[in-house]
Amino acid sequence: MTGVPSNIGMRTLRWLLAVSFLVGACTQGTPSAPPTAPPATSVGTPGGTPVPAAAVLADGSPLPSGCSGPSLPSQTVAFVSGGRAWALDPTTETLSCLFPVRDPGPFAWGPQGDRVLLGGFRVRGLNADAPDLPGIAAQPATFDWGHPIGLAVVFADAAGEPEKRFMDDGRVERLTALPAGTYLHVAYHPSGLALAFVVDQDGEEAIWFSTNEGTDATRLVFGQGGTRFTSIAFSPDGQRLWWVAEHAGGYPVLHWMDLGHRSSFTDVWRGSDGTFAQDLQLAPAGSLKSVNTGTVCDQREALIIEGGSATPAMPFEDRPTAALGWLDRSHLLVEAGGCARPTQLYSVDAGGGQPVALVTGAQLASPRTVLRNAPDTVPAPNSAAGQPPLGGLG
């Protein structure tokens, strides 16, 4: 797979940015590790299995014993602890208990922060306009919420078959118009009118684009020589499709394609040889992105990408880190620790500054960021020349 070359060589760009970073670091004094909140402890069962205790807040205070809301839009950090779901404002530290939960599953919030996907494909809503749906037998291996409201979830089950569950009545429909294959990743266009998929067909992966009903499917990009696509995402304005390709040579590359001109794509960032990147996430506005690198838990590292440069989200953190998602255009929710150790949640300012400790010992966490100013159209190729070649780009 090839792409449009950048104006500055990738090695040159990384070198220049590295020098700039070092110069800035020298003028700002000796760096220090981020603050650490008091640890959450564990208690043992009769069989000796540790049971996580309730999480503690950054100031060391325990979570409240009651469970009352309502949640606020500013409470963009959601987490699970002590059998309950919580929402926290990362700036004011205002906390709300949302609801009891036994199986949080993916704990993935819809684009308006008013509904969440739980274990067993149950859906829990936070207000009268949001759905409460029981679980179903399907176990989504990959999924994405419908946009801009969250009226459906498109997913692929364990067998890789593409399906859609509707929030009005809970029904599930197969997207039979899509090409055959094993569906590995899915992304909903922010307008809600289109879908993108990574599909494996006989061991070869490709990126497909379709309407929100799975019709008019077009192959945009296909992998060559064993290239795998580990993540896909649309830009917040809906103009571009982004993806991470793990090349057979053993390095990741971040690419984008202009949906109005689908005859080419651009290489943005190349990871080091022998590395693996996934979990691509785009900030809700602006140009920032994040990925997670590493193939095993204790090697995880969250990276922030701007332009062609990637830097660690928490460069002075010794524990494994993982980007969980963007809280706003410049703040990233990052988890440090894990791997059989207590986790700690931080709000990381991509512009610099000390990471802000939020919670220690949460069982699970995710952003609850509200989608705003969503587009209402999908870019169409601006001419015949803007269409992808028959079969896609390789």
Where would I find each of the regions flagged by the language model?
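N-terminal secretory signal peptides that target proteins for export/translocation
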Residues: 1-10
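Sequence signature of WD/YWTD-type beta-propeller architectures
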Residues: 28-394
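Enrichment for repetitive, rod-forming helical segments
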Residues: 18-21, 131
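Sec-dependent signal peptide recognition
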Residues: 11-18
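C-terminal motif of bacterial Sec signal peptides marking the signal peptidase cleavage site
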Residues: 23-25
